Amino acid sequence: MQRRIFGIETEFGVTCTFHGQRRLSPDEVARYLFRRVVSWGRSSNVFLSNGSRLYLDVGSHPEYATAECDDLAQLVTHDKAGERILEDLLIDAERRLAEEGIGGDIFLFKNNTDSAGNSYGCHENYLVTRAGEFSRVADVLLPFLVTRQLVCGAGKVLQTPRGGVYCLSQRAEHIWEGVSSATTRSRPIINTRDEPHADAERYRRLHVIVGDSNMAEPTTLLKVGSVHLVLQMIEEGVQFRDFTLDNPIRAIREISHDLTGRRQVRLAGGREASALEIQREYYARAVQHVESGDPSPTTQYLIDLWGRALDAVEQQDFSSIDTEIDWAIKHRLVERYRSKHNLTLSDPRVAQLDLAYHDIRRGRGVFDLLQRKGMVRRITDDGEIELAKDSPPQTTRAKLRGDFIAAAQEAGRDFTVDWVHLKLNDQAQRTVLCKDPFRSVDERVERLINSL
């Protein structure tokens, strides 16, 4: 599949403090955040005019699901637009709090763990064809996803009984199964629940829930782009060395705790391999695969970054990736802060810095401050992100949904939408079923919009 549909769902951590003390419960904060949404959408689960879905997930976590994208840079832009949309809600909620005499600062964190040890996710979605054996996709992908944190982790200062440890991944400590149909109860690496949100005879939706939420645009690009390339190779019948892991859950934690990438993990046949070895195998195949075609500049950059990230780990010199890969950017930040103030990794101020990296409020969040200083590389720009807050991707089904929502809202009409249905809640209950996620032009939708 040369052209693929991608989407990212991100759950955000939320808290409200007043002079450093917790002010409101997460439930109360979430209610303030979503008050504006509920006032126009009559629900805390809505689709927006840019084709995305915004809702309150289990445990009072705001969640943003991007519209269907068919281009990696487009996906990065729409993922960032979600941050800006939630930042707007945050600013509005703080204003309401002030009007009601409740002082306080609301924080939204694009991370995966809170101080109490709870975890919330970043789920990636990939459209795959129904043809072929899905179990083979899972078998080939699992070792790749377990080791991908080496190049895509968000980084985390983990507090252990032996003191603070710098880890590659936030999510690794919270994954309990390899492949499963549940997402919250068991937290697998690949979710197999078959909900394609498309023509079920032609497509499946691969739902990957092991990844970290990323702040750095190049890391998001590499995270999704590398999976896309591995899927392409599986679809084309490329054979990979067998890296089936003896215990994927133990392996994912062991790899996260080892910045050298050299720690050996047990494979199913009794052999051992390191995360670096496993990633090198997938990377080498990806290079061959890409060079056999006519790669776009984005794909060329992706392959270059992937290779540089592996080289940086192998050489233990992260300076070549510490403006592009989240865990390396944060590692540089933490190490400079520690040496300046003579701190250990167990110091609460280091934990505070770790958290502040993921604060999405511009002008306050540490990642944004680094970006303003030109210390992190961009894939998109602020103008594109601003546009994506209101406009859907123009090349996928999201355009149909976004255009319908915008037109219905402008006409003051009552409507219901989901990923595949567009429905006018009038006497006729007119509904259009959009089963092809690649289709951005549909006469039935045009007729529905023209009838408003």
From Swiss-Prot:
It is an enzyme of class 6 (ligase). It catalyses: ATP + [prokaryotic ubiquitin-like protein]-L-glutamate + [protein]-L-lysine = ADP + phosphate + N(6)-([prokaryotic ubiquitin-like protein]-gamma-L-glutamyl)-[protein]-L-lysine. It comes from the Bacteria. It holds the Pfam family Pup_ligase. One of its GO terms (biological process) is protein pupylation. Pathway: Protein degradation; proteasomal Pup-dependent pathway; Protein modification; protein pupylation. ATP binds at R53, T66, W419. Keywords: ATP-binding, Ligase, Magnesium, Metal-binding, Nucleotide-binding, Ubl conjugation pathway. The active site is at D57 (proton acceptor). Its EC number is 6.3.1.19. Belongs to the Pup ligase/Pup deamidase family. Pup-conjugating enzyme subfamily. This is Pup--protein ligase. It comes from Saccharomonospora viridis (strain ATCC 15386 / DSM 43017 / JCM 3036 / CCUG 5913 / NBRC 12207 / NCIMB 9602 / P101) (Thermoactinomyces viridis).
